[in-house]
């Protein structure tokens, strides 16, 4: 072999080696790209997982806030209700006192000069007492002439009456009372048939 042939062969050999190195480098780059793509896919999956966890946590926080708000509102309503109706049993206990004062005024002879000062004292006591309990929300239910309503009235008897429309209250036997819109005692009434 001559030097020229050797040169060509060496040049070819150098070229082959250079091409082999390029191929090897390209394969390394492909492996590196594959590894990077795998890492990117892993990171994207982790990101999606983190985002879904964040959404779940945000939903949990919103639900917790709503629950706390509902509890606060319920508590306020219960406190308001308790405040309004705390006097219910006390009011029930006072009703016989009002009834007895009214009976005393009905039984007394207001024209009798001996009884008149006593009658006026009972009348004044009754008025003061009724005014005082009214300040705390206790109101009288006196439905004479109204249409019978079982929520506010208790029918003690039903009678025919040409002077009254059917199903109206003819006579109140005992006044009823309500406390802040809630019936403490229904009015005992006689209803027209």
Swiss-Prot record:
A single Gene Ontology biological process assigned to it is:
protein folding
Q: Which domain of life is it from?
A: Bacteria
Tell me where the signal peptide lies: none
Q: Which UniProt keywords apply?
A: Chaperone, Cytoplasm, Stress response
Stored InterPro entries: GrpE, GrpE_coiled_coil, GrpE_head
Family that this chain belongs to: Belongs to the GrpE family.
Role played: Participates actively in the response to hyperosmotic and heat shock by preventing the aggregation of stress-denatured proteins, in association with DnaK and GrpE. It is the nucleotide exchange factor for DnaK and may function as a thermosensor. Unfolded proteins bind initially to DnaJ; upon interaction with the DnaJ-bound protein, DnaK hydrolyzes its bound ATP, resulting in the formation of a stable complex. GrpE releases ADP from DnaK; ATP binding to DnaK triggers the release of the substrate protein, thus completing the reaction cycle.
Q: What is this protein called?
A: Protein GrpE
Native organism: Vibrio atlanticus (strain LGP32)
């Amino acid at each position: 072999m001559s030097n020229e042939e050797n040169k060509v062969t060496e040049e070819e050999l150098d070229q082959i080696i250079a091409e082999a190195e390029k191929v090897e480098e390209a394969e390394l780059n492909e492996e590196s790209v594959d590894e990077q793509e795998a890492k990117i896919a892993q990171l994207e999956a982790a990101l999606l997982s983190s985002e879904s966890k964040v959404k779940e946590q945000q939903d949990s926080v919103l639900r917790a806030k709503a629950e706390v708000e509902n509890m606060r509102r319920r508590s306020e309503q219960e406190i308001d209700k308790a405040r309004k109706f705390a006097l219910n049993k006390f009011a029930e206990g006072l009703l016989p006192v009002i009834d007895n004062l009214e009976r005393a005024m009905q039984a007394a002879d207001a024209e009798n000069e001996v009884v008149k000062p006593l009658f006026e004292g009972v009348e004044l006591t009754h008025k003061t007492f009724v005014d005082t309990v009214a300040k705390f929300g206790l109101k009288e239910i006196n439905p004479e002439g109204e249409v019978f309503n079982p929520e506010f009235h208790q029918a003690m008897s039903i009678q025919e009456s040409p002077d009254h429309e059917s199903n109206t209250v003819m006579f109140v036997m005992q006044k009823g009372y309500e406390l802040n819109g809630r019936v403490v005692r229904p009015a005992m009434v006689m209803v027209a048939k």
